[in-house]
């Protein structure tokens, strides 16, 4: 062997060659793929670190819907490294951002088929899988491309489902049949699966009354180990709650999204929620409403038997002069004053003042620690909340407000807010995560 190919003697090496393994691993952990490959050429020890399982447990691959040459190269590199070090992978996240034509969805489908096939052969450690916002009901997904992707994912979950602990398919937008096909793969050749966290929010397409599907109810009966469940209200039925009751010992959290375009007129019995609350003694339910603001609709959904921890009401800037929030704030939400901990309100109430109703609601909910409000309010509302906090009538830890106004100039309101802040500065800095601004809505 000639001199140039001989290993460098220890006394000739840089001090970086003797960096402790723990420190060296952290250095590599923060490097991107390209820099890692370059660092691996420094010396034998650094090359060996490249094969440390610690570096490859977590992986995120982002596919752009409008890729540049640089981004395409980065994706190819990321996929190559996942295939090479896939045996160490424990947490995989895949993002596909707004594809604009069928060529890109086809390329994504082919890439994912190869990636999932490779992992199913080499990996036995994967604990979590996240593939969000695919929106498979869009026209850019040709039927053949969509079917091929669903088949690849289903085959992968059949092999990996017995070890998978976390699955996030938020925003997939599937038919009931397609969605159940994928979820059924988790319990292939078994009557149950070990998933503890399942996110199927916006998993099904808009306008689907999933709560009427016997297939969906049968599929959900195979989840015996759920701790956390995210889904839409158009999936909720008495039968689903009954299934959850049968395996309720582990259930802790249900996050429910209710969108105006999703069917939400089904009748759920309060006794079904009450039974689930008795079986799952630590259960907390969080509701997220989008453009569902009418009292009659909310009252059908927010039953007093539900152990509600959090409520989010968002109108998304839509205004309905015929819709009043007063009954909701006065009669409905106080029903949950003993359990409600987080409240988010974003609505266009230009036609009615709600300062007094909101203030009374806050001081009546004794466990409320998080309050976020975007609405037409008087600036004095902020001082009333801070005064109540000082007098221990409420126990907020987070207070965020965007005060809408129809005025173009907000100098006067800004000045008043500054005076309020100075007056309660000690309270704010010691007790609150505080953010309040005036926002002009023209």
From Swiss-Prot:
- What exactly does this protein do? Substrate-recognition component of the SCF (SKP1-CUL1-F-box protein)-type E3 ubiquitin ligase complex.
Q: Name one Pfam family in it.
A: F-box-like
The protein's name is: F-box only protein 39
Quaternary structure note: Directly interacts with SKP1 and CUL1.
Query: GO CC annotations?
Result: SCF ubiquitin ligase complex
Transmembrane stretches in the record are none
GO biological process per UniProt? SCF-dependent proteasomal ubiquitin-dependent protein catabolic process
Q: Domain named F-box: which ranges?
A: 16-61
Checking CDD domains in the record gives:
F-box_FBXO39
Give the source lineage, highest ranks first.
Eukaryota, Metazoa, Chordata, Craniata, Vertebrata
Q: Which InterPro entries does this UniProt record tie to the protein?
A: F-box-like_dom_sf (IPR036047), F-box_dom (IPR001810), FBXO31/39 (IPR045048), Leu-rich_rpt (IPR001611), LRR_dom_sf (IPR032675)
Tell me which PANTHER family the record gives: F-BOX FAMILY PROTEIN, F-BOX ONLY PROTEIN 39
Q: Which UniProt keywords apply?
A: Ubl conjugation pathway
